[in-house]
Regions:
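Membrane-cytosol interface segments of multi-pass membrane proteins
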Residues: 1-233, 254, 281-286, 344-345, ...
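Structural signal for the C-terminal ends of transmembrane alpha-helices
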Residues: 88-96, 135-136, 188-197, 262-273, ...
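Membrane-interfacial catalytic/cofactor-binding modules of polytopic membrane enzymes
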Residues: 228-232, 237, 241-251, 260
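Membrane-interfacial loop- and helix-cap regions that link adjacent transmembrane helices
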Residues: 235, 241, 268-272, 282
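Alpha-helical transmembrane segments of multi-pass integral membrane proteins
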Residues: 250-258, 262-264, 283-416
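Secreted, luminal/periplasmic, and some membrane-associated catalytic domains
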Residues: 276-279
Length: 435
């Protein structure tokens, strides 16, 4: 009897061990990824710089200040990298060489629809709300027929495909037009990227960097513009402004930057199965951060003479490097809580809140700026243009920030808006399946 009890005990322990080993993989599957609040703050700093850069010429004529804050064409590449980074982080598995299948169900088209519907509702609402502002300028210069065509291009997010019309209506939103194409590509690219091991990812990273460098080099070579500073350059003085537009606005070339971000994310996400040397100085976020700042400041002070295109091809891998290091520093358990780190600063709640309202800032700063600074619009509304009042610039910044905070609370967090957006998204997904 005692022997039977011992056998049962051994069997029970084996059964429990087997059960625990069976459930262990399930825990890994359902385990959520660590949150990366620093990414929100990084988004705010990028958007803040871009928003100020778009209108700084309306507030100052100081050459140094203009050069320091007009490198928007350089910094916007980092915005695409961050978008690709987040997309890969949310749609692939941690410490596994596979994508997250449910993110691409029921079809790959559904992934694109869901990503686009994440930003289209506010974009659409802004188009409607500020349409009178957009039409004042468009109808004045182009007439009603072309304005109607331009409305179709902007509402369909097709404007980035037209080099001379990429900045129609709400100029900064050409970014969303290009990003939309990237989200068409990603559901087909991410599953393959997720399968790659570190060496494969590193090779792909280098190839993407070389490809984007080739594009920028070809442009600079053909226009003899290696030393151009396009951010402050009048279009009439450029040998081929259309060529420049076709490079900086191209959805195809922007997708390369998005893929660089996706590959960067995967390089960090497999750290648990392919170890890296965390003690290396190259893993410190401060190194790429200083190099990025040095690039911007060096060009501002004319210490470094290079075109926006070449600078962007350098800035993009530096930002990818910085983002990977911030990610590793955020999830690392080695630094003590008392130690200073850039990731802890970027995770500060006021900064993450600004990160939360950064998308409304990006959408709203353009049309609000047009009201005060676009000559044909401001003269129609106020009888003068606010470029004559440089002291108004901080007020404009305040108006944008307050408006973004209100929109975040009233529109983005609105349950009815969220429900309507979800219903539209589901309907479009169902339509894509039926086809």
């Amino acid at each position: 009897m005692q022997q039977q009890n011992r056998r049962r005990g051994r069997l029970s322990s084996k059964t429990n061990a087997a059960a625990s080993s069976d459930t262990e993989p399930q825990k890994k599957v359902t385990e959520s990824k660590p949150r990366l609040p620093a990414m929100d703050s990084m988004r705010f700093f990028l958007i803040g710089y871009i928003a100020i850069g778009h209108f700084i010429a309306c507030a100052t004529r100081d050459p140094l200040l203009l050069k320091m804050l007009s490198q928007v064409n350089v910094v916007v590449g980092a915005f695409f990298v961050l978008s690709g980074y987040v997309a890969a982080y949310t749609a692939s598995e941690l410490n596994k060489y596979e994508h997250t299948e449910k993110r691409f169900l029921p079809t790959k088209v559904a992934y694109t629809i869901q990503r686009v519907m994440g930003y289209y509702p506010l974009y659409f609402a802004t188009q409607i709300l500020f349409m009178p502002v957009f039409l004042i300028a468009d109808v004045t210069y182009n007439g009603w027929a072309k304005s109607a065509l331009h409305a179709g291009l902007t509402f369909s997010l097709s404007q980035a495909w037209f080099p001379s019309h990429a900045e129609l209506w709400n100029a900064p939103t050409w970014f969303l037009s290009a990003l939309t194409f990237a989200f068409v590509v990603l559901p087909y690219a991410l599953p393959s990227i997720a399968k790659l091991k570190r060496k494969g990812l590193q090779r792909l990273f280098v190839k993407l960097i070389l490809l984007t460098c080739l594009v920028k080099f070809a442009y600079c070579y053909d226009v003899s513009g290696f030393a151009f500073f396009e951010g402050t350059m009048p279009p009439k003085t450029h040998p081929s402004w259309m060529f420049w537009n076709s490079v900086r606005f191209s959805p195809l070339f922007s997708t390369i930057d998005v893929l660089i971000g996706a590959v960067s994310a995967r390089l960090v996400m497999i750290d648990g199965v392919e170890k890296v040397n965390f003690d290396s100085v190259l893993q410190k976020p401060v190194i790429p951060l200083l190099l990025m700042i040095g690039l911007i400041v060096g060009r501002g002070y004319s210490i470094v003479s290079m075109s926006d295109a070449i600078a962007r091809s350098i800035f993009v891998p530096l930002f990818a490097w910085f983002t990977m290091n911030i990610h590793r520093e955020t999830v690392s358990s080695s630094p003590r809580a008392s130690q200073f780190s850039i990731s802890s600063v970027l995770s500060w709640k006021p900064l993450t809140y600004l990160g939360a309202i950064s998308f409304p800032i990006y959408i709203l700063h353009g049309p609000i700026g047009q009201i005060f600074y676009k000559r044909v619009v401001a003269n129609k509304i106020f009888g003068f243009v606010f470029t004559s009042k440089p002291e108004f610039f901080p007020v404009w910044i305040g108006i944008v920030l307050v408006s973004a905070a209100i929109v975040n609370e009233v529109f983005l967090k609105n349950k009815k808006v969220q429900e309507l957006s979800k219903n539209v998204s589901n309907s479009l997904v169902s339509l894509s399946i039926s086809e």
